[in-house]
Amino acid sequence: MCQIGIRLFNWYEPPCVTVSQNLTRNPIRFYSRRSFIISKEEKPKLCHSKLFPTKMVMKTNGFVDGSLPDELKKVLRLVGSEWGDVVDDMESLQVIPLKGAMTNEVFQINWPTKCGNLDRKVLLRIYGEGVEAFFNRDDEIRTFECMSKHGQGPRLLGRFADGRVEEFIHARTLSAADLRDYEISALVAAKMREFHNLEMPGPRTVLLWNRMRDWLAEAKSMCPARCVKEFRFDSLEDEISMLEKELSHDYLDIGFCHNDLQYGNIMLDEKTRSITLIDYEYASFNPVAYDLANHFCEMVANYHSETPHILDYSKYPGLEERRRFVATYLSSAG
């Protein structure tokens, strides 16, 4: 039975507005009161550079002044109606860009309730274009829906072709320094154990090695020959095979891993001291030891510095810190 996380909120939440799996580029078509698809003419694009290869370029400048696309307005009206709100006056909406997302663009959208207070909040996520090189968007959507149903992460409120509307989590995103805080680190360790024990659909097949090969092939296809030689891409193929052979054992504990537990994907409710893991683009079955090790590696990064692409390995956790984290993980009920 799936281990269900503790909900951060206990107020009424509307049912999810589902969408047809056939995400075509046609104009909005209603299949039922809660089933619709939306098209979007302009999509964000992915730029590449030698130093920071995944910088997003978005085309949603109109969101800032409140001029939302008509298709999105229809989604918000439908989501609002589930709360008993009437979202007709789009001029009353507050649209606030949120920073920190790497493969999407996210906005906080507020609208007044019947009492006239701006206290209804949702999160709008616009998918980035070109990220299919790194993960499968359909798999990510299915994972998000499953997590939402099991009380993990934000609740899914609505979907459209190039994005979705999510529950707004009233918690703060961690900072790079937070990962080194003893109390917060212990909370993260316990939450990881719970996450790994989730009973998720699909075969428990390790994705790590094939994903690395796919990423390597993608990197080779977009880099000039001199870069392939300079960065020794060919030797990386041999290294992946060597690691797979050395680290693939029957005794390894395979669980559903987040695979991207950097500080920006971890939220903390200061009142309840509850941890929420968000953004499941890379989530899959893998050895749980890999997810732990990857989290340690993320401690050397600061994506909000002037040089987000430079990793400071002097900040890698020492042996005692790693032992403490693993001990907390193992002692947690999950």
Label the model's feature ranges.
Residues C2-V95:
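Regulatory N- and C-terminal appendages and interdomain linkers associated
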Residues S67, E71-K74, V106, R142, ...:
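Acidic, Ser/Thr-rich intrinsically disordered and amphipathic helical segments
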Residues I96-S235, E246-D253:
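ATP-binding pocket architecture of kinase catalytic cores
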Residues M267-Y303:
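Catalytic activation segment of kinase domains across protein kinase-like and atypical kinase folds
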